[in-house]
C-alpha cells in the first residue's frame, strides 16, 4: 500500500493532501528565521551567526555603516563563530540590506541652565567606549569594550593612558574603590576585574555559575561590597573584595534581564529589569529581592539614578519616558521624553538637584535635564552626535560625564548655571 492508498483509506483525496502539504510547507518556510531577509551570499551566515545569540529580527533595526562595522568587531571580540574570510562579505551584506532606520529629530528646549559640553576622542579607534567613570582625582575613565582596554583621560591636558586587559574580556561597567583601584565587569568573559593603576596589574574574579556569563553594571555599597547585574544570565551578584566570595541572586521574574544598578542612602540596592516592566531592590542583609511593577506592561527601564529623598528615577528605553518611583509607596509618575516615544532614553544620573540623561536614538543624541520641582525639561544637542550614550557618571564637583560609544569619544558636561 502506497501513500495515496493510505490517504484514500481514511476518506481523503490525494490531491487535497498534496495541496495542503504544499501550503504547510510554504507557511513553514515563511516562518523560518530570516526568511524575509534580502538575498545575498552572506544571508545564511547572518541568519546562523547572528541568530545564534539574538532574536534574528533585531538585525532589521539597522545601523549606520560604521555602526555595522562596530557590531561586527563586537561579535568577533565576543567569540562569535565568524569565519575570518567571511567578515567583509557579511559586513557588506548588513550595510546594504539593513541601513539605519528613521530616527526622531532631537527636540531642543531652552531653559535656565547653561552648559558647555566637551568631548575627547579615545586613544584606540573603534574601541566603543561603553561606560564612563569620574574618578576622585578628576580623571575620566572609560571601558574600551571592543579593544579590551581601560582608558584614563586627564581632562586638563587631554592626555590618555590605556591599560590592556585580557583578550575577549569585553570590559563594560566601571567603578572606583576607596583605594583608587578600578573595578570592571568582563561582559564577554564571565568575570569581575580589578585594575591597580599604579602597577597595571589586573586581578580577575570568575563567576561561580557558568550561566552568569555576562556581568554588566556594578556599584559599591557603603560597606565596600560590590554589587553587579548579569543581564542575559538573569542574576544579580554580590562580591566581597576582602575574600573574593561571589554570591549570585536570581530575581523572581524569569528573563528579567537585570541592567542598571545603584545604591540609595540607606544602603539598599536598586536595579532595573530591562526584560520586564519592573524596578527591584535588594535588602543587603537578608538578600531578599522586592520587585516594583511599573504601570505600563510595555515599559522597559534600562538605567536608574537615586534622587533627593531616595526617589528612584529611571529611563524607560522602550516607550521614551522618564519615570519616577517612590519606593516607600510604590507610586510611579512618568513624563514623555522631549524627543518622543522613539527617543530611547538611556544613560542617566541625578546631580545638582536635577535628573540628567541622554536620548540615545534622537538625531543628534541629546543631554536632557529634568527639574523635579518645576517638572520642566531642558535639552542640548551633543556636539559630536553622541551616538548612544549608554551610561553616565558624576564628577566630585557634580558634573555629568558620558561615554559616546559609536563615535568613540568620552564627554564632560560643565554646568554653568542652575542649582
Name what the model sees in each region.
Residues 125-137, 167-179, 210-223, 254-268, ...:
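Beta-rich, blade/repeat-based domains predominating
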Residues 78-107, 355, 400:
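C-terminal capping alpha-helices of c-type cytochrome domains
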Residues 108-126:
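A short helix->beta-strand "capping" segment at the edge of beta-propeller domains
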Residues 387-419:
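Blade-level signature of beta-propeller repeat domains, shared across WD40, Kelch, NHL, RCC1
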Amino acid at each position: 500500500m502506497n501513500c495515496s492508498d493510505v490517504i484514500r483509506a481514511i476518506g481523503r483525496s490525494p490531491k487535497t493532501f498534496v495541496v495542503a502539504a504544499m501550503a504547510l510547507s510554504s507557511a513553514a518556510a515563511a516562518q523560518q528565521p530570516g526568511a524575509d531577509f534580502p538575498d545575498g551570499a552572506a544571508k545564511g551566515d547572518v541568519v546562523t551567526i547572528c541568530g545564534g545569540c539574538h532574536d534574528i529580527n533585531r538585525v532589521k533595526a539597522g545601523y549606520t555603516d560604521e555602526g555595522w562595522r562596530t557590531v561586527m568587531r563586537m561579535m568577533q571580540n565576543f567569540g562569535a563563530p565568524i569565519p575570518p574570510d567571511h567578515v567583509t562579505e557579511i559586513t557588506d551584506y548588513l550595510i546594504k540590506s539593513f541601513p539605519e532606520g528613521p530616527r526622531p529629530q532631537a527636540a531642543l528646549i531652552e531653559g535656565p541652565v547653561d552648559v558647555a559640553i566637551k568631548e575627547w576622542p579615545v586613544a584606540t579607534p573603534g574601541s566603543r567606549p561603553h561606560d564612563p567613570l569620574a574618578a576622585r582625582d578628576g580623571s575620566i575613565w572609560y571601558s574600551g569594550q571592543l579593544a579590551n582596554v581601560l582608558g584614563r583621560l586627564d581632562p586638563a591636558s587631554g592626555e590618555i593612558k590605556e591599560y590592556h586587559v585580557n583578550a575577549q574580556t569585553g570590559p563594560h561597567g566601571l567603578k572606583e574603590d576607596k583605594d583608587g583601584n578600578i573595578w570592571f565587569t568582563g561582559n564577554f568573559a564571565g568575570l569581575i576585574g580589578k585594575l591597580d593603576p599604579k602597577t597595571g596589574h589586573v586581578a580577575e574574579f570568575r563567576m561561580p555559575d557558568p550561566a552568569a556569563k555576562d556581568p554588566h553594571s556594578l556599584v559599591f555599597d557603603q560597606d565596600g561590597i560590590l554589587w553587579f547585574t548579569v543581564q542575559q544570565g538573569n542574576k544579580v551578584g554580590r562580591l566581597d573584595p576582602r575574600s573574593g566570595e561571589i554570591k549570585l541572586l536570581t530575581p523572581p521574574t524569569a528573563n528579567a534581564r537585570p541592567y542598571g544598578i545603584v545604591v540609595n542612602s540607606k544602603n539598599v540596592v536598586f536595579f532595573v529589569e530591562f526584560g520586564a516592566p519592573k524596578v527591584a531592590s535588594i535588602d543587603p542583609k537578608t538578600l531578599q529581592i522586592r520587585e516594583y511593577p511599573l504601570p505600563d506592561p510595555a515599559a522597559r527601564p534600562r538605567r536608574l539614578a537615586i534622587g533627593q529623598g531616595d526617589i528612584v528615577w529611571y529611563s524607560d528605553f522602550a516607550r521614551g519616558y522618564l519615570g519616577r518611583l517612590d519606593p516607600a509607596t510604590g507610586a510611579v509618575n512618568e513624563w514623555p521624553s522631549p524627543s518622543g516615544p522613539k527617543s530611547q532614553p538611556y544613560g542617566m544620573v541625578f546631580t545638582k538637584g536635577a535628573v540628567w540623561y541622554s536620548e540615545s536614538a534622537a538625531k543628534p543624541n541629546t543631554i536632557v535635564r529634568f527639574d523635579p520641582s518645576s517638572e520642566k525639561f531642558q535639552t542640548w544637542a551633543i556636539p559630536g552626535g553622541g551616538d548612544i550614550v549608554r551610561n553616565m557618571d558624576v564628577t566630585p564637583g557634580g558634573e555629568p560625564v558620558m561615554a559616546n560609544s559609536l563615535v568613540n569619544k568620552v564627554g564632560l558636561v560643565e554646568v554653568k548655571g542652575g542649582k
